[in-house]
Amino acid sequence: MDEQSQDASTWSAYIDEFARWALGEALWWESNPDENGVGGDEWEAVEHVTVADIADDRARERWMQMCREFVEMNKEHLALLPAESAGQLFWQSKRGRWGVPGRSFRVDKRLPKRARRALHRASSRWPVGYVFIRDEKVHFEL
């Protein structure tokens, strides 16, 4: 395998993991709010969920497109982070003031300050609505 093919394969795997962990973070944070409107499942309730569990084919394609575009636009900075962390940070940054500030790109010290700001701002480009699990499938508005 030549270097270019290996690089493409590596980033393809990164995108898949990024998408899975971003979805897990979204479900952990957003789904099944309690009676006070506080969102979130226990992590154990959502850690098994994958992108394949997104019920609607178009929504699944759009989710992957969003993740792919974000990763491809920010490879230089994301190369400093494992896909798991980057996916989780992406979702919280994406939520902006409705996310958990301590779990966003803005505060991750593994990144230079300029990269933290750039990734945090870039995360808000794609609108995603409410996320929930029903009948073992993921549903959300894209």
Predicted regions and their residues:
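Amphipathic protein-protein interaction modules
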Residues: 61-137
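Long, contiguous N-terminal structural blocks used for assembly/anchoring
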Residues: 1-81
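Non-transmembrane, interaction-prone alpha-helical and coil segments associated with secretion
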Residues: 141-142
